[in-house]
């Protein structure tokens, strides 16, 4: 064992050993309890960032810990390899997406290995490979046959100059990111999967996910958005037309003062005939972004259609307006507006001077003042005819029943959740396996023609998808008949919705999944990933699992038992203002800072001596140039140090503030562990500890050791408070560093302690612990060593330190037998000189005794 800790020497050696021994390669073993630990697979962007390192370190710590408990642990890794960034990079670098992607995978795979993650590399998948997406295509055709897939027209972002569809992120201030043309909304046919058929299951089964963060479950509940309400039919005045609205507030029905419809509503189209102003407004609405975040903040605009609807209960004529905040894809494409009791309706009515009719009393029974804002609380009805005096619940039922009796109402359950649109008009994605025959009929690609392979040797012009630009690619035949392939590709969320299941049998070529392997490993025992995926990936992930269950591919109802959402990694951000007022962000590695006595940054300059503005801590990002390259840190300090800092600096679910001083601290700690082990080894390894011959100091140290084992086991396994587990080992190390090593018993105890410390640190810092385990004479390799078990007998305390108070003030401390009675403690306390002084000549009126902790004598 060398005297100095040199990670550059040991880490590559240990990693080579793992590779050669295939240490983390696993197979199904019915005789062992399985544990499947999975971190969300990365997009191969080119380089790992610190967010990746945090995510994968957490997963690796859990995996290694569970492995030491004797479980058969699967921890796989792969690449979410399709996606828009590859297309942009290909155009920029004059290449095709495939070679760019594969080069990135090779580079990032090497980075992952440098960090020492214990992956089963034999199961590595890349979602852009035909042997992966062929089964996704096959499954899609089966869903189509079951009636769970359909095609309909839907709005997309369209660049009229480039004649291409744009993703939302390619629309900047309403213009095309590439040519700056004004983007239009265009209706085109797209494929959808009926996730709404599973809305109730997805909602109800959230209650079964007891080990998922409540925040994620709440976000999914809100996204599914189940509501109970009434669908009401309105007749259009002076016409035969009717249209429907859905409301969750039938109690406000007598306060409706206008109706708002979507620009794409058939009534709007009819009203626009011969009305140029309305036609122009409808066209403007078509170019409105439809994301809910945009809808919430955009200016609410509208225009009267000139049409009126008849209120079905009181016969009032209600104006019908086209409004830019009503979407055809949501509900019925029409809403009833009650401006007195809905803030959005109030703002619209105020802008266009529409009437408002309050129908709900305030909590104190007064008519509401709606001059400044709507009164949105529920309450007792007034101004509502036969429904006056009813509270919300009674009014809901009464109004609903009245509408149903009149033949114009129906109770309905609605969902905010919409069917999943899986079509993308991009090239770098899995081709959708559908085809159109000469007679116009659409059929799924026959199984024998799967996979529909995406050509990889293409030329990117940055505008049109190569498979759309090449008419010959789409041409094919079915049973001798000419047919055209679908040229849209799948949303990349498709690939990431089932990859976890394919990891259980990545080489299986007889079907999508090998049922035996899938049902051995699934569900995932621990899933790790960011909370930003709560309502997209994690919803589709759950949905796909239920689809696979119903197809007989898996037995379980949910894909993952336990979910941990790690926090973001933050770093200092600095900038200077350019000549045009723009902010130029400077990397923290190029900044020199001065700090005050509390460690706060007071001044910052770059390498040119330019004074910088400190913008505080923010998420590491390219836009603020404040990312720290993990590879640089590994080269400087070693992978174990980086891993240890990542797990110690913050609770896993909280944001982590990157501080290089903290990294240096983690490195110093590992050097201390190394030095203590080196010093111990140089004196010769000790023989077995004689538990019958321990002195009091040795008993106390061994008690601390086994209490630490118990705490670290609980912190990692149950609580997942990894930072407190590391802190407990650090505290123990402080005691071990001060412990004597002269006698054989002292050294035998040190040997027991060091072997336990090395195992407790192994999940966090596996390379150094692998090396120290061998140096300390541990049996076999630490990769197969069992987790240390706390000795209950060692944790029993023979004595306790009791604080003695007189009238609530500390007057002494005494050591007593752990099971000493109140009388025994009082007798010993009375013999303590300082305590006796305060008891002299007074009467003890009350005794407060907390066994093992406190004796308080109240005197007077």
UniProtKB/Swiss-Prot annotation:
Positions of ATP binding: 622
Catalytic activity line of the entry: tRNA(Leu) + L-leucine + ATP = L-leucyl-tRNA(Leu) + AMP + diphosphate
Record has RNA-binding as a keyword: no
EC identifiers of the protein: 6.1.1.4
Segments carrying motif 'HIGH' region: 42-52
Primary subcellular site in the record, as a coarse category: cytoplasm
Location of the protein in the cell: Cytoplasm
NCBIfam families: leuS_bact
PANTHER family hit by this protein: LEUCINE--TRNA LIGASE, MITOCHONDRIAL, LEUCYL-TRNA SYNTHETASE
Protein name as annotated: Leucine--tRNA ligase
Protein's gene: leuS
């Amino acid at each position: 064992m060398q005297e100095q800790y040199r990670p550059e020497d040991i880490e590559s050696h240990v990693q080579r050993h793992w590779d050669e021994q295939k240490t983390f390669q696993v197979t199904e073993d019915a005789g062992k309890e399985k544990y499947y630990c999975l971190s969300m697979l990365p997009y191969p962007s080119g380089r790992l960032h610190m967010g990746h390192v945090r995510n994968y370190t957490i997963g690796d710590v859990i995996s290694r810990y569970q492995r030491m408990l004797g479980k058969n642990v699967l921890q796989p890794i792969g690449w979410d390899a399709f996606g828009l960034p590859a297309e942009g990079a290909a155009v920029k670098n004059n290449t095709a997406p495939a070679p760019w992607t594969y080069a990135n995978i090779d580079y990032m795979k090497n980075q992952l290995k440098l960090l020492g993650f214990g992956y089963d590399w034999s199961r590595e998948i890349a979602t852009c490979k035909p042997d992966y997406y062929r089964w996704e295509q096959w499954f899609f055709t089966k869903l189509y046959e079951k009636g769970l897939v359909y095609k309909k027209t839907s709005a997309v972002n369209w660049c009229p100059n480039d004649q291409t569809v744009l993703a939302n992120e390619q629309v900047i201030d309403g213009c095309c990111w590439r040519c700056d043309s004004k983007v239009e909304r265009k209706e085109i046919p797209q494929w959808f999967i009926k996730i709404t058929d599973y809305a109730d299951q997805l909602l109800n089964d959230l209650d079964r996910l007891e080990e998922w963060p409540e925040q994620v479950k709440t976000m999914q509940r809100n996204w599914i958005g189940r509501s109970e309400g009434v669908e009401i039919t309105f007749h259009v005045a002076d016409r035969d037309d009717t249209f429907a609205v859905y409301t969750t507030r039938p109690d406000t029905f007598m306060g409706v003062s206008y109706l708002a419809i979507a620009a794409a509503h058939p009534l709007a189209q009819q009203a626009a005939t011969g009305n140029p102003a309305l036609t122009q407004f409808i066209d403007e609405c078509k170019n409105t972004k439809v994301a809910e975040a945009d809808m919430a903040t955009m200016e609410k605009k509208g225009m009267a259609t000139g049409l009126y609807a008849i209120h079905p209960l009181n016969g009032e004529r209600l104006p019908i307006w086209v409004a830019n905040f009503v979407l055809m894809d949501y509900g019925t494409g029409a809403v009833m507006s009650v401006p007195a009791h809905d803030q959005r309706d109030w703002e619209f009515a105020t802008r266009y001077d529409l009437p408002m009719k309050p129908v709900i009393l305030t909590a104190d029974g007064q008519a509401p003042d709606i001059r400044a804002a709507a009164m949105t609380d529920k309450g007792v009805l007034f101004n509502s005819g036969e429904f006056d005096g009813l509270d919300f619940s009674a009014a809901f039922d009464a109004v609903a029943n009245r509408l149903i009796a009149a033949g114009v109402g129906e109770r309905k359950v609605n969902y905010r959740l919409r069917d999943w649109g899986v079509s993308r008009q991009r090239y770098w994605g899995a081709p959708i396996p559908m085809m159109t025959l000469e007679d116009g009929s659409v059929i799924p690609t026959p199984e024998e023609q799967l996979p529909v392979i995406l050509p990889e040797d293409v030329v990117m012009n940055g505008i049109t998808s190569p498979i759309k630009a090449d008419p010959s690619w789409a041409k094919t035949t079915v049973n001798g008949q000419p047919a055209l392939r679908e040229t849209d590709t799948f949303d990349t969320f498709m690939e990431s919705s089932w990859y976890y299941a394919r990891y259980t049998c990545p080489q299986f070529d007889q079907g999508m999944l090998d049922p035996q392997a899938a049902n051995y490993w699934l569900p995932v025992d621990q899933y790790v990933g960011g909370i930003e995926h709560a309502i997209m990936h994690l919803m589709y992930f759950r949905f796909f699992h239920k689809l696979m269950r119903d197809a007989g591919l898996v037995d379980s109802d949910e894909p993952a038992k336990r979910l941990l959402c790690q926090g973001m990694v933050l770093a200092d951000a600095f900038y200077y203002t350019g000549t045009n007022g723009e902010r130029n962000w400077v990397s923290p590695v190029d900044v020199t800072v001065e700090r005050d006595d509390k460690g706060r940054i007071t001044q910052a300059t770059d390498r040119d001596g330019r004074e910088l503005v400190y913008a505080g801590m923010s998420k590491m990002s390219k836009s603020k140039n404040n990312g720290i390259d993990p590879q640089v840190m590994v080269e400087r300090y070693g992978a174990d140090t980086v891993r240890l800092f990542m797990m110690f600096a913050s609770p896993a679910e909280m944001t982590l503030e990157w501080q290089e001083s903290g990294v240096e601290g983690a490195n110093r700690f590992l050097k201390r562990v190394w030095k203590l082990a080196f010093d111990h080894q140089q004196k010769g390894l000790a023989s077995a500890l004689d538990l019958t011959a321990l002195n009091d100091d040795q008993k106390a140290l061994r008690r601390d050791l086994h209490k630490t084992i118990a705490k670290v086991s609980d912190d990692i396994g149950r609580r997942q408070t990894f930072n407190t587990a590391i802190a407990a080992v650090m505290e123990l190390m402080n005691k071990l560093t001060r412990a004597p090593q002269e006698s054989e018993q002292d050294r035998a105890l040190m040997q027991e302690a060091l072997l336990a410390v090395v195992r407790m640190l192994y999940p966090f810092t596996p390379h150094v612990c692998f090396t120290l385990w061998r140096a300390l004479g541990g049996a076999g390799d630490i990769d197969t060593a069992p987790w240390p078990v706390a000795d209950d007998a060692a944790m029993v305390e023979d004595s306790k330190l009791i604080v003695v108070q007189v009238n609530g003030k500390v007057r002494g401390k005494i050591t007593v037998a752990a099971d000493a009675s109140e009388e025994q403690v009082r007798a010993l306390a009375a013999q303590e000189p300082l305590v006796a002084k305060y008891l002299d000549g007074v009467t003890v009126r009350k005794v407060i005794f907390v066994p093992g902790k406190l004796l308080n004598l109240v005197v007077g």
